[in-house]
Structure formats: structure tokens, C-alpha cells
Amino acid sequence: MTKSKSILTTSFFAFLILIGFAFKSEVEDQSEWKTLFNGKDLTGWVPKIHHHESGDNYANTFRVVDGLLEVNYDDYGAFEDRYGHLFYEKPYSSFQLSWEYRFTDQWLEDAASYTYRNSGIMFHSQAPETILKEQDWPISVEFQLYAEEKEGVPRPTGNMCSPGTDVVFEGKIDPRHCINSSAPTFKWDQWVKADLIVYEDSIVHHLVNGDTVLTYSLPQIGGGVANRFDPAIKVDGTPLKSGYIALQSEGQGIVFKNIKIREL
């Protein structure tokens, strides 16, 4: 075999090996995804609603309808600040969470005005069983979900809010409870795909329809907003390296689908 043929043969086999590794990597990446919502029932999920004990799904707030996980208030009278969260049963540390959502036209008028077309995904949260009956918000970080409130007025989705927590944004702890993303504004009945990428207590990325719209770092316990919590849980300055994921209910109807996660 000539030298040139040897080089070509070696290059060809190297190319095949690279293709093989790429294919293997793609398959492995796909196999890493775990579905969190089975489309049939709330297996693996635990509700915690303000004024109620952990595990009490008051008035069937969280339900499955036509394969979608729905936040619904059909069986409510007055809202009475029943801010709720549906927790997945397992905590996560470094992960990519992916889901799709859209709002419904249901909103309880006695809920706070800011809850209109507003929901969220909490992460790095305290465990649901540690949330006191009269504690309003879990100590956690929130990927806030918004839709248009007034036509033509920007209201980006994918923001960050911080009940009982702090984050570092643009090099310093940001004193604001919520930090706006660069995402567009969506109509309330549009399906939107969102992704949350978290590396323990280091970097957090918010993605909307595949675009990174917000990045911040060093999530930690601190700040205000959460009330009537167990002081033993809220130790300010504690890095949030892991925690629970939860879907929010705060007076606005919303539906979720294709909720899945992979650990990083």
C-alpha cells in the first residue's frame, strides 16, 4: 500500500470512528431524558397549597385533563390566597428541565392582580413536607411564566423571581425580587416551550423556544417575600446546590405538557 493510500485509509477509519462516537453520544443524550409527567395521573407529584397540609390537593387544583397537567379552579369558591405548588417527589442538583405550557382563560378575580396570566416553575426548593401550613411561598427560585396582559405592552416570559432566595446577576447580588428576561411577549393561548439549565449553585440559564433569555449565578437562601416559614430552614447565605421542582398555582389557569428532565 502506498503512503498516500495509507493516509487516506487511516483518515477514513478515523472519520467512521468520529461518526460512531457522535451517533452514540446523540443516542445517549436522548436516553438520558426522563419524563416527569405520565399524561395519565399525578403519580410522583405532591401538592402543597397555602392554608393546607402537604399532600392535600385542595379542590382538585392540580388535575389531568386530556393528557395535560392542568391548574384549574372550577371547584373553588373564594381564592383566599391559596397559593399552591405541585412538587415532583425527587430533588435535583444539576439538570436540564424542559416543558411546554400555555395559559387558559380562567383567572380568579379575588386573586392578587399580579397573578393575571402569571405562573411559574420553582426549583432548588425546600421539600414540600418542610413547608408550614401557613407559609405562603416555598423558599426556592422561580422561572416565571408570563403572557401578554395588555395588547402591545411588552411582558416577557422566562423571568427570575426569588421567594426567600438571592441570586447574583451581572456580578452582584441583585436586590430585586424579580429580574426580567429578554424573551418576547406571547399571547395567553400560545404554546411556549421552555428550558431551565441549572448547574448546582453555580450557573442558571433560562431558555424560551430554544433561545437563552436570562443567565444568573450563585442561587442562595436570603431575601424576603416568603412568610411564616420555619426559621431552621431559612438560613441566609446558604448555597442552594439542589432542591425540588414545583409547578405553581396562584389564581391563574395554566396547562403543561411534555415535562421532562435530564441530569447533567
What spans do the regions from the language model cover?
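Bacterial Sec-dependent N-terminal signal peptides
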Residues: 1-29
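Carbohydrate-interacting regions of secretory-pathway proteins
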Residues: 23-264
